[in-house]
Amino acid sequence: MSKKALLILHGKQADNQSVRNAVIDWRNQGHELAVRVTWEGGDAERYVREALDNGFKTIIAGGGDGSVRDITQALMENGNSELELAIIPLGTANDFATAAEVSEEPADALSLLNRPAQPCDVIRVNNHYFLNMATGGFGTEVTTQTSEELKKMLGGAAYLLTGLTRFSEIESAKGHFKGEDFEWEGDFLALGLGNGRQAGGGQRLCPDALVNDGLFDVAILPADMDLLAGVKELFDSEARQDPDQEGLFVRTRLSEMKIETPTPMNLNLDGEPIQNTTFQIQAIRNALRLYLPEGCPLLG
């Protein structure tokens, strides 16, 4: 059956020949595929609105986790749970797509449109939305302060290098976390709220998260000075594959949670930083329909 879709392509990928070839091949199969290229902030959201006004129900995010977040935000603001999202991973880390096992080959990623789209959750933080993960504390500083030049040269390893060079500057944050049958208060070094499983270039903060369970996974790394050595171990290759090997994290799984902090805290939503002293988090079940590969580990 012919598909009608809009590909919103990150401006840095405008000359990507693999993407161009995949688009041409897809069109030659009889599908209608329009392409828009972003130039500045706000373009992705504007293109989504224009697409929906013109009868498109399927949007393809051609970019990294930030592009996926921008498009997810625009789709959620529309309020239609029948809208469909596909991903062509073209960013530095591609954390959500990597955990979902979406191919980085544009033609293969585009071919997922031949499969049924799966109902998936989106997480709301105050009036913002994200698909993959929100991070706070030290992990947020690493992600937001890693230079674009370093990311271009080293890919996901850039986040690791930034974390190691800033290790002596680690400062904890203080917060009060409350949800159904869960309450925790104290100083923490890192926080992950996961619909997906990893962030910051492969750090698996929420290794068991699912995108279709109506919940988000919570991972809190307490600021216990005796565990600082364990924090450093999170940045070596072995520990990065199993961050719970030392039992460092406080973990739970919730549909709603409130975070309160005595001073403004930065929370990074798939690359988009927001700042507040109160965060109301909610999992919105079956908010969007995603094109994911067969056997996707993020589906329960």
Swiss-Prot record:
Cofactor(s) needed for function: Mg(2+); Ca(2+)
Amino-acid positions noted as binding Mg(2+) in the UniProt annotation, renumbered to this chain: L210, D213, L215
One Gene Ontology term of the molecular function aspect: lipid kinase activity
Top-level taxon of origin: Bacteria
GO biological process, one term: phospholipid biosynthetic process
Gene Ontology CC annotations of this record: cytoplasm; plasma membrane
Protein name: Probable lipid kinase YegS-like
